[in-house]
């Protein structure tokens, strides 16, 4: 009924009428309801994201440059062909690469990654008037090449173009944006990545110009994936109805939809999940990517799914102490290699906060939550 009441996924289009997934996903975060963003269901109109933006902007551009993402999130994004790049991890933390996806984390690109989009954040020669623009320049680590549009809109990686400063970011150790040898050690990307998503592209910390953006609490894409998830648990045989709403999200994202034949973007569809378990995992992965870095959606999902193992153990990033553009695992100075950034502990009792002892003392009928 949402569509009948004027709500819709926010989309922008190329000159030929095709969906521009880069501009659609990016401006979904910045456009207000009265500017055509009918995806917003609930929002806080009076909200400040100054600190969020300030901590996401690179140190060399006068930001604090410490708000980033983990390697595990980078791994979760699909390839441009709609297939997952990483399907899991070995006991030693090594990624299990999906060879069918074309993913490669060895070497660097020799050609720019050019797509049909008006998005101008990918390289210095990008223009809104262009039919096509570079979204990843030549020389980009292959881990970041041929990924889906949501990846480039969401993650700022070493060597990416940063338009506000007209330069490529430098996350190498003691680099312009990297970890310093002394001083404010945390004002640098601890995992080798910073956030790009929800940081308005016109943000300029140098003159403290941070454009307004709505505080979106709930949007239509979440309603779609909530419905798909619930239906898969209740009536998994209704595959067509489930995929309808998953595919609506993937359509806007510019990646192949599930099914057979051509999808609405003219792309070859990829095989649909084979059973309820596979569908559950597909929906969960779509949620992780689509809602990355939006409030507590991911954490709340993990809690309600009771996936305790995701919340504990080793979390990876790139080698923030690396000084060389190298992906050689045997080179201690190589930046582009996986490194354990932090090891976290999480037990079952951490699914909930305890009730304060003062409250228990006031009401003998209250019972403490499990394991506290």
Which residues does each predicted region cover?
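Alpha-helical solenoid scaffolds that mediate protein-protein interactions
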Residues: 1-3, 249
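Long, intrinsically disordered, low-complexity segments
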Residues: 10-88, 172-173, 177-186, 191-195, ...
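Flexible, polar/acidic helix-loop-strand segments at domain edges
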Residues: 72-219
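Short, hydrophobic/aromatic alpha-helical segments in well-folded domains
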Residues: 150, 226-227, 245
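Structural register within alpha-helical repeat arrays
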Residues: 220, 227-229, 234
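Structural helix-adjacent loops and short alpha-helical linkers that scaffold large soluble proteins
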Residues: 234-242
């Amino acid at each position: 009924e949402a569509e009948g009441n004027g709500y819709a996924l926010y989309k922008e289009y190329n000159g030929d009428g095709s969906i521009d997934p880069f501009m659609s996903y990016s401006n979904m975060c910045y456009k207000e309801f009265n500017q055509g963003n009918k995806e917003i269901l609930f929002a806080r109109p009076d909200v400040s994201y100054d600190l969020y933006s300030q901590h996401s902007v690179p140190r060399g551009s006068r930001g604090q440059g410490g708000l980033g993402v983990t390697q595990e999130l980078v791994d979760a994004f699909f390839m441009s062909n709609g297939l997952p790049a990483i399907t899991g991890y070995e006991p030693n933390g090594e990624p299990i690469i999906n060879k069918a996806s074309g993913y490669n984390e060895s070497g660097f690109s020799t050609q720019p990654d050019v797509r049909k989009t008006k998005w101008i954040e990918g390289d210095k020669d990008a223009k809104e008037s262009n039919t096509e623009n570079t979204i990843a320049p030549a020389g980009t680590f292959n881990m970041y090449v041929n990924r889906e549009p949501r990846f480039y809109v969401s993650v700022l990686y070493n060597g990416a173009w940063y338009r506000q400063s007209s330069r490529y970011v430098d996350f190498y150790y003691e680099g312009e944006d990297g970890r310093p040898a002394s001083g404010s050690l945390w004002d640098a990307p601890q995992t080798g990545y910073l956030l790009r998503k929800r940081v308005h592209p016109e943000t300029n910390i140098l003159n403290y110009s941070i454009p307004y953006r709505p505080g979106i609490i709930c949007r239509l894409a979440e309603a779609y994936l909530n419905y798909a998830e619930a239906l898969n648990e209740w009536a998994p045989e209704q595959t067509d109805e489930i995929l309808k709403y998953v595919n609506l999200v993937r359509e806007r994202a510019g990646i192949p939809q599930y099914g057979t034949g051509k999808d609405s973007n003219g792309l070859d569809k990829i095989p649909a999940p084979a059973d309820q378990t596979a569908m559950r995992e597909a929906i969960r992965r779509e949620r992780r990517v689509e809602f990355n870095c939006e409030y507590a959606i991911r954490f709340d999902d993990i809690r309600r799914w009771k996936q305790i193992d995701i919340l504990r153990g080793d979390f990876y990033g790139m080698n923030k102490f690396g000084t060389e553009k190298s992906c050689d695992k045997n080179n201690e100075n190589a930046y582009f290699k996986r490194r354990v950034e932090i090891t976290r502990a999480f037990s079952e009792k951490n699914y909930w906060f305890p009730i304060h002892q003062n409250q228990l003392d006031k009401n003998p009928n209250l019972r403490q939550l499990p394991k506290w």
